[in-house]
């Protein structure tokens, strides 16, 4: 079976991009002939992870330079590069807009599939951000709600012809998506958002695949004081790091004055977040590491006990099952894909992500758990994550879905 996997850009390392590459490796391991096609490619960050899978790209990222620009809409004439050579394939899988609707408008190959990490937020801010839509008004000073109001929902974005979410662009996207042969979503939450954005479509859920390392047993509870807390995320406002910093500052002042927060990731909000840490008086306890390799993230994880991340309207969040697989106790938001991963709070603490007090209380609740409860929670979280997100579980589900379309290995 010949498979083409389409993605607009492989320059920064995010959950959607990691999942796309892992799916490509899984399909290749099942015996398919797989090629990845993307506009922009950063070999320094991706070559090792991609391995032997061929990558066709239009422009390479130059180290130290900004990533090359990529098409932002399916009508961009540069989309022709992404859709080239599809006639020779049996299956094409699009990841991320505008590859999704562009593939739906194409006539080849026989099976055109969109793996939906989330519908494009800038086109469908209300449909894809139900939590922010319902809660932005109660926390107007928080950066996430402010970003929702002033950027995602800006009046300029809705202007005819020139607006990013103009009626014309939304209509073109919907036509393309409805032309697809199949849609797979990364969570039940995303499936519902797809239906809110595009109407009543047949959407199947295929959970992302997570590699779980064979680590030493972390039984033995937690140290009582001086906890290491890890967060891994892109530093942008919808990831809600400002609330996490506020909550951590309160937790540190009230419950654990020797605790430290390790922030892994990069993004445009970093300078403002570093300044916020200084204003809160926790600059010495918050460590901004920037981008780290998988090996360095694993090493840092081994020195931490808790994982905390509070993204707003997160469709899935690869970092949550990854943290569970490393034996970290997990704190996440009370909605979206993370709530689904944490089984409604059974496998970790879930809190109101716009309340620093709730964040501090959640961290304290985990930190004060008995050793027996800590070990039970770690074991339950790891078992559940492996059952849903392991390579074996994903391969079994993927085979079943493809067989419905006469695609076998």
Where are these regions (language model features)?
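A charged, aromatic-enriched C-terminal amphipathic alpha-helix characteristic of glycosyltransferases
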Residues: 74, 372-403
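Membrane-proximal helix-turn-helix segments that form the acceptor-binding/catalytic region
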Residues: 120, 131-183, 191
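Conserved donor-binding/catalytic core segment of Leloir-type glycosyltransferases
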Residues: 184, 221-239, 245-248
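Nucleotide-activated donor-binding/catalytic signature segment of Leloir-type glycosyltransferases, i.e.
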Residues: 272-292
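Short alpha-helical donor nucleotide-sugar binding micro-motif in glycosyltransferases
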Residues: 291-292, 299-304
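Aromatic "clamp/platform" in nucleotide-sugar-dependent glycosyltransferases that forms part
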Residues: 312
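Short hydrophobic beta-strand element within catalytic cores of glycosyltransferases
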Residues: 329-332
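Conserved acidic donor-binding segment of nucleotide-sugar-dependent glycosyltransferases
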Residues: 344-357, 364-371
């Amino acid at each position: 079976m010949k498979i083409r996997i389409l993605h607009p850009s492989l320059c920064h390392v995010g959950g959607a991009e990691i999942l796309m590459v892992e799916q490509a490796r899984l399909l290749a391991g099942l015996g398919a002939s797989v090629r990845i096609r993307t506009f922009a490619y950063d070999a320094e960050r991706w070559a090792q992870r991609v391995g032997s899978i061929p990558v066709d790209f239009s422009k390479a990222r130059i180290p130290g330079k900004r990533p090359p620009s990529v098409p932002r809409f399916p009508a961009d004439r540069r989309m022709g590069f992404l859709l080239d050579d599809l006639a020779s394939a049996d299956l094409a899988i699009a990841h991320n807009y505008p590859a999704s609707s562009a593939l739906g408008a194409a006539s080849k190959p026989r099976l055109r599939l969109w793996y939906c990490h989330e519908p494009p937020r800038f086109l469908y801010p209300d449909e894809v951000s139900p939590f922010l839509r319902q809660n932005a008004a109660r926390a107007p000073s928080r950066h996430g709600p402010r970003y929702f109001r002033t950027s995602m929902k800006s009046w300029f974005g809705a202007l005819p012809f020139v607006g990013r979410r103009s009626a014309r662009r939304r209509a073109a996207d919907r036509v393309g998506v409805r032309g697809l042969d199949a849609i797979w979503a990364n969570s039940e939450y995303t499936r519902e958002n797809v239906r809110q954005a595009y109407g009543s479509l047949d959407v199947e859920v295929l959970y992302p695949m997570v590699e779980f390392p064979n680590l030493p047993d972390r039984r033995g509870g937690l140290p009582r004081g001086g906890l290491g807390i890890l967060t891994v995320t892109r530093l942008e406002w919808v990831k809600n790091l400002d609330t996490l910093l506020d909550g951590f500052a309160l937790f540190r002042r009230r419950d654990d004055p020797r605790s430290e927060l390790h922030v892994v990731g990069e993004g445009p909000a970093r300078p403002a977040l570093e300044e916020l840490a200084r204003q809160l008086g926790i600059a010495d306890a918050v460590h901004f590491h920037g981008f780290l390799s998988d090996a360095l993230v694993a090493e840092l994880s081994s020195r931490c006990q808790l994982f905390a991340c509070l993204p707003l309207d997160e469709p899935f969040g690869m970092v949550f099952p990854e943290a569970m697989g490393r034996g970290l106790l997990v704190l996440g938001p009370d909605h979206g894909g993370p709530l689904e991963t944490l089984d409604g709070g059974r496998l970790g603490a879930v809190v109101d992500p716009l309340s620093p007090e709730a964040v501090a209380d959640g961290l304290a609740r985990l930190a004060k758990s008995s050793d027996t409860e800590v070990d039970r929670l770690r074991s339950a979280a790891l078992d559940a994550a492996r059952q849903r997100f392991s390579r074996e579980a994903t391969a079994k589900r993927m085979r079943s879905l493809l067989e419905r379309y006469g695609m076998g290995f």
